[in-house]
Amino acid sequence: MLIPSKLSRPVRLDHTVVRERLLAKLSGANNFRLALITSPAGYGKTTLISQWAAGKNDIGWYSLDEGDNQQERFASYLIAAVQQATNGHCAICETMAQKRQYASLTSLFAQLFIELAEWHSPLYLVIDDYHLITNPVIHESMRFFIRHQPENLTLVVLSRNLPQLGIANLRVRDQLLEIGSQQLAFTHQEAKQFFDCRLSSPIEAAESSRICDDVSGWATALQLIALSARQNTHSAHKSARRLAGINASHLSDYLVDEVLDNVDLATRHFLLKSAILRSMNDALITRVTGEENGQMRLEEIERQGLFLQRMDDTGEWFCYHPLFGNFLRQRCQWELAAELPEIHRAAAESWMAQGFPSEAIHHALAAGDALMLRDILLNHAWSLFNHSELSLLEESLKALPWDSLLENPQLVLLQAWLMQSQHRYGEVNTLLARAEHEIKDIREDTMHAEFNALRAQVAINDGNPDEAERLAKLALEELPPGWFYSRIVATSVLGEVLHCKGELTRSLALMQQTEQMARQHDVWHYALWSLIQQSEILFAQGFLQTAWETQEKAFQLINEQHLEQLPMHEFLVRIRAQLLWAWARLDEAEASARSGIEVLSSYQPQQQLQCLAMLIQCSLARGDLDNARSQLNRLENLLGNGKYHSDWISNANKVRVIYWQMTGDKAAAANWLRHTAKPEFANNHFLQGQWRNIARAQILLGEFEPAEIVLEELNENARSLRLMSDLNRNLLLLNQLYWQAGRKSDAQRVLLDALKLANRTGFISHFVIEGEAMAQQLRQLIQLNTLPELEQHRAQRILREINQHHRHKFAHFDENFVERLLNHPEVPELIRTSPLTQREWQVLGLIYSGYSNEQIAGELEVAATTIKTHIRNLYQKLGVAHRQDAVQHAQQLLKMMGYGV
C-alpha cells in the first residue's frame, strides 16, 4: 500500500514569494529532457517547483525518503507518479510494479516507454529529494530512463547535490535545464516581498537588502529571521548577522536558541515527537503525541511558521521541512531518549491501523521492540514477501532473537524462503535442520511438512531429484488440504522429478494438477512454471503441435498477469525457439532466442548460455559457419566462467560437436571426448542429449562400434520411456553412422524410420544439419519414388532446406570442376564432342540437388522459360529424355571424379 502523501505535490502556501524570474525560466522546461534544481537545504527548491506545477494537470510528483533506496519501493512509487500524471494510462506497468513482475528497473522503464508512446501530450515527472538515493542500481536505471524517455516527457529532479544521472552529457547536448543555489538565492526585491508578507511592521528596503546580503539570499535563514522577529527575541538585523556565513550543517545551535527555546513546553514536545514521522496525518499525530485534535494542532504549527508543509491538496498529510525535520529528530534522540521507544511503538501501531505494515516495521525496528516486530511479521510478512519487500524482511528477521523464530516456525520458514529466493540453497537446509533440532514436537506438526516442501524445492534446484522426490512425497502426505502454497510447491517438485526420471505421462498429469491449483490460488509464477514443464514434456513425447498450443497458453498467462520480466519468461521463449528451429522456421527461432536474451539482459551473462546456444543452432542450420564460430567463441568463454546445470552444459556441447562435425575438427572432438561427463543413465531427454553428443563425436572420429552401442542403448531407453523426439534424433545420428561406415541398406532403413516418425514430430532442421550426406540419401529415396506421400513431401522439403542453406554443397559443377572433368580420361565422348555451357553445367548441378524448374529460375535469377530452354539443350547434349536420367548421369560423373554419392 502506497502512502498518499509521497505522491502529492506540496500545496502552494499563502504568504510565499512568487519567484517570477525562475518561473519564467521553467516555462520552457518541456523543451528539455531534464530540469535539475540543485542547492543545499533550505533554498526553496520544493516551493519553487510547487509554484511552477500549480495549474498543471499532466504532472506526477514523487517525494523521496531514505526507504526509497529499495528498488521495488522506488519502482512502485515512480510508476504510481506516472499514473497520476497520465490518469492511469500505463496500466500494464502499474500491475507489473505492484506485483513485482519485472526483471529490473530498466526493463520496467522500457515497458513504461512502450505504453507512453501512445501518450502525446506534454508530461512532467517531479522527483523531490533525489540526494537521498544512494543505491547505484537506481542511479543506473535513472540514467537509462533519461536516455530513453519519450520526447514529450520532462523529468524534474530536486536534489541537494549533483545527482549521478549523466549530467555532463545532457549539458553538452543542450538537453538540461539547470537552476542552482545562486539562482535560487533571494534577490533584494524578493527578500523585501518576503518580509512584507511575514512581518506585521515592514522594514526599510535598505535594511531588507542588507539582511539578504548577510545571509546570501538563503531562504531558510530569511524564514528564521522572520520567525525570530515575530517572537521579539532579536531585531531582524541582529538575527541576520548571527546567521551570516552559517550553512545547513551548523544550524543546530541557532534553531535551539531561536525556535525550540521560544515555544512553550507542550509545543516543544509536540515538535520533537511528531518529527519521528516521515509524513503525518491526524490519526498519526493523535496517537504519537497524545494530542486530541491532531489536524488542528498541525494547522496551528503551520500558522506559526514552524517549517511544517502540506503534502496534498486535501490538507490531510503534512511533513516538516527536511532541514528542520532532521534537526528535530536529532534533538528528540537527546531530549526524549527514554520516551523514544514508546513514541516509535505508538507510530507503528498507528501505521498498522491505517494499513501500512512496511512503515510500521520501520518504527518497530527503531523502537527495538522484538515482540511488536514479530506480531507485524506474523500478520503481514507473507504479503510483503509476495510483493518482493525482501530487504525489509531480511532486516526485520535479523532483528528478531533466535528464540522468537523458534517459537514461531512460520518465521523460520519465511527466512528459509528468503534464502531460497536468493539461491542460498546450502543455508536453507542448515537453517531448517537447526530449527527442527531445537523446536519441540515439530516433526509431528504441519510446519514440518511445509519445511519438507521447501526442502524439496531446494533439492530439485540443486540437481538432487531422488531427495526432492522423498521430501515432496512426505510433504504431500502430511500437508492439510488448505495449506495450498506448500501443496503447490510439493506437487510441482514431484512432477519435475518424474520428468527427470522419464516418467512423462505421470509427470504431465502432476504438472497439469499444479497449474490448476496455482491458477485457483493466484500463484501465477507456479502456474507459468507448470505450463512450461508441460510443454517440455509434450515436446519430449513428440507431440510438438500440442506443445506449441501449451506454449500459447503460457504466453497468454504472461500477458494477462504481466509476467513478461520474470526470468521464467526466458525459459518459455527459449523452448518456443527450440520448437521453431525443429520446424525450420529459423528466422522466428532466432528472434525468439534473442528475445530470451533481452529478458535476461539485467542478469549475469552466464544466464544467457542456453539462448546463445540456440542462436548458434540457427547459424548451423543455415550453414553459416563463420557466424557460428563467432558465437561459439562467446559460448565457450561463458562455459569457462560459470557453474551450470548438466542439461545446460549438454545443450552447449551439442552445438560445439555439430560445428566440429561440419568443419571436420577431429582434434577438438577428441579432446572434448576425453574430458566430457558420461552419465550413468539415459532416462530423460537431458541425459539422452549428452550421450548423443558423445556418439556424434565418436562418429566424427571414426569410432563407429562404440557409437553404435551408445545409440542402440539410447534407442532402447527412448522407446521404453516414449521419448519420441529423442528417438527421432537418435535415428538420424544412427543413419549418419551407417552411411559413413558404408552400411547403406542399414542407413536407408533407419532413415525411413526417422522420416516416418517425423510425421509426428514435424522435424525438419534435425535432418538439415546432417548436410550433404542426408541430401544424397534423400535424392535417392525421391528418385525411387517409393516413399509414402507424407514422407515424400517431407523429404522434398528437407532437401530444399539443405539446398537453400548449404549452397556450397552443389557447387560441384563450377568452372574448375568442369575443366578437370573434361580432361578426365574416362569422360563420356558425348560430353567431349558436345560440351555444355557453363550455365548448363549450373543447371545440371541444381537438378541433381533436387531443385524444381521454378527454384532453378529463382536461384539463377532468370525467367522460367529460359530455364526450360537450358534444360532442353542440356538433355539433348547428354542424350537423356527425363529429369531422373539427368540426375543419374550427374551422379555417374561425380562418382567418376571421386565424389561419394
Curated annotation (Swiss-Prot):
SUPFAM superfamilies: C-terminal effector domain of the bipartite response regulators, P-loop containing nucleoside triphosphate hydrolases, TPR-like. It holds the Pfam family GerE. GO terms for molecular function: ATP binding; DNA binding; DNA-binding transcription factor activity; identical protein binding; trisaccharide binding. One of its GO terms (biological process) is positive regulation of DNA-templated transcription. Residues 853-872 bind DNA. Residues 242-436 are annotated as: DT2. InterPro entries: P-loop_NTPase, Sig_transdc_resp-reg_C-effctor, TPR-like_helical_dom_sf, TPR_MalT, Tscrpt_reg_HTH_MalT, Tscrpt_reg_LuxR_C, WH-like_DNA-bd_sf. Activated by ATP and maltotriose, which are both required for DNA binding. Negatively regulated by MalY, MalK and Aes, which bind to MalT and block maltotriose activation. Residues 437-806 are annotated as: DT3. Residues 807-901 are annotated as: DT4. The keyword Transmembrane does not apply. Induction: Expression is induced by the cAMP-activated global transcriptional regulator CRP. Repressed by the Mlc transcriptional repressor. SMART domains: HTH_LUXR. Residues 829-894 form the HTH luxR-type domain. Coiled coil: none annotated. ATP binds at residues 39-46. Keywords: Activator, ATP-binding, Carbohydrate metabolism, DNA-binding, Nucleotide-binding, Transcription, Transcription regulation. Positively regulates the transcription of the maltose regulon whose gene products are responsible for uptake and catabolism of malto-oligosaccharides. Specifically binds to the promoter region of its target genes, recognizing a short DNA motif called the MalT box (5'-GGA[TG]GA-3'). Displays weak ATPase activity, but this activity is not required for promoter binding. Consists of four structural domains: the ATP binding site resides in domain I (DT1); DT3 binds the positive effector maltotriose with a low affinity, and the binding affinity is increased in the presence of DT2; the C-terminal domain DT4 contains the helix-turn-helix DNA binding motif. DT1 also contains the region that interacts with MalY (but not with MalK), and the binding site for Aes is also likely to be contained in the N-terminal portion of MalT encompassing DT1 and DT2. Domain DT3 may mediate oligomerization. A study on malT mutants has shown that some of them became nearly completely resistant to Aes repression while still being sensitive to MalY. These mutations are located at positions 38, 220, 243, and 359, most likely defining the interaction patch with Aes on the three-dimensional structure of MalT. This is HTH-type transcriptional regulator MalT. The lineage of its organism: Bacteria, Pseudomonadati, Pseudomonadota, Gammaproteobacteria, Enterobacterales. The gene is malT.
